[in-house]
């Protein structure tokens, strides 16, 4: 298998604290990998080790087939990154920042700067000083620098940070185009679970430094179990009636009953009729579906 990112037993400790604990990542070329976790779970520390910004306590890191070493060697000409807030010179304009980055990358094409300005919607801010930009436009500038040299791999820490809803959609569509049209591999951390759900082809969940679950996009779809949520003034009677009617497991959650039996989910009117006839009419009846956010919260709560 040809991996864009490969780690084996990746561990980073600060004293007695293991920020990253034996993480094994396998990110295939061309995929969009969403890296989820609470604040302090180890996302940014993992990303910094992938980029050679910090050295792991133990384990091995390979990026685009090259081992990331202490001497700074790696495939960095083929990697674009944005980690936390982009560093800028307040007195330089957007265009000057990108021109400086173009020279540092030794890019001979003078149109590269104009290309990323257009890609990131920065045309009207191109000659504005970075110190006057909003947080969202600073994030766009950071993404423009990451894309300037047309990398094969993008490593992004919270790429939607500071963007308004329209900006989030723009960046999502840009990343999708890069992956689908150019085969760019994208490894991104985010706390916006809905965006990861829409964008990622595979999702990894890190908690307390450990990679506790990985999901393919198809698995994310299948985990969304539909269920029927019922509220009534007489939960005891309702529960007894539904159990006797062989509707499978009847789960009590606070002031509600839930049924996962497909017969109940597909025909809630039958459940309503049954409860009305039994003298326990429902005051609330709705088909609900678990999403990635609920699954994530249940998972980390169970660890």
Positions of predicted regions on the chain:
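ABC transporter nucleotide-binding domains
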Residues: 2-7, 12-207, 211-213
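Alpha-helix N-cap/helix-start and coil->helix boundary motif
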Residues: 11, 95, 119, 193, ...
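Residues at or immediately flanking beta-strands
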Residues: 60, 227, 281-284
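ABC transporter nucleotide-binding domain
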Residues: 172-262
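C-terminal coupling/interaction segments
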Residues: 263-303
């Amino acid at each position: 298998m040809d991996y864009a990112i490969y780690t084996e037993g990746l561990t980073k400790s600060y004293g007695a604290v293991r920020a990253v604990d034996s993480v094994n990542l396998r990110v295939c070329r061309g995929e969009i990998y969403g890296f989820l976790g609470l604040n302090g779970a180890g996302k940014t520390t993992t990303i910094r080790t992938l980029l050679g910004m910090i050295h792991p306590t133990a384990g091995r890191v390979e990026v685009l087939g090259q081992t990331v070493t202490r001497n700074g060697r790696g495939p960095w000409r083929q990697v674009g990154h944005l980690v936390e807030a982009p560093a800028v010179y307040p007195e330089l304009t957007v265009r000057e920042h990108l021109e400086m980055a173009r020279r540092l990358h030794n890019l001979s094409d003078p149109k590269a700067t104009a290309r990323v300005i257009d890609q990131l919607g920065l045309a009207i801010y191109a000659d504005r000083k970075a110190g006057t930009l909003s947080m969202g436009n600073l994030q766009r500038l950071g993404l423009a620098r990451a894309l300037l040299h047309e990398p094969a791999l993008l490593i992004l820490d919270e790429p939607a940070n500071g963007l308004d809803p329209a900006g989030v959609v723009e960046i999502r569509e840009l990343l999708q185009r890069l992956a689908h049209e150019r085969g760019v591999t994208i490894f991104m951390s985010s706390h916006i679970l809905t965006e990861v759900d829409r964008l990622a082809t595979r999702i990894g969940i890190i908690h307390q430094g450990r990679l506790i679950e990985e999901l393919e996009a198809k698995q994310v779809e299948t985990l969304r179990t539909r269920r029927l949520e019922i509220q009534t003034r007489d939960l005891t009677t309702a529960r007894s009636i539904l159990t006797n009617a062989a509707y499978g497991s009847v789960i009590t959650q606070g002031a509600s009953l839930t049924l996962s039996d497909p017969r109940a989910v597909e025909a809630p009117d039958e459940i309503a009729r049954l409860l009305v006839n039994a003298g326990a009419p429902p005051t609330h009846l709705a088909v609900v579906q678990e999403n990635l956010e609920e699954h994530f919260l249940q998972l980390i709560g169970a660890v």
